[in-house]
Amino acid sequence: MLVDSISEMNITIREATTRYINITCKSKETGEPFDFTGFTVQTYLSFGEYQEYVNTTIVENLVSYKIPAEASLGAAYGVAETRIFKDGNVYEILRINVNVRKAEKPDTEPNQNE
C-alpha cells in the first residue's frame, strides 16, 4: 500500500443524528483544489458495535458521505476513514475522529403556566 499522505481532523456530533460529511481537498503544495477525477474512494465507519462501509462519492475535489443516525446511537466516539485509491493503491487517507455528544432528553414535565 503506497500512501502519499494521511489527513486527520476532529469533529463533534450529537448522538442519534444523521450527519453529511463534505470534504474539499486541496493540494498541500499549492493550496489549489485537487482534482480526483479517475480516482476511486471507500469510507469505513467504526462507532462501537456499528462498523460498516458507507456509500461515498468523489467529484473533482469533493468527497461526500453520510454518517447515519444509528451509527452514533449509544457511542461515545467513532472514526470515519476514507481511502482514496489511484491505480489500485491507496493514495490518500482522510481520517475523521468523531466525538459523540449525548442527546439531551426532552422535557416531559407539563408546563405549569398552561
Q: Language-model segments: which ranges?
A:
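N-terminal assembly/attachment segments of tailed bacteriophage virion structural proteins
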Residues: M1-T108
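Compositionally biased low-complexity segments at domain edges in trafficked proteins
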Residues: T108-E114
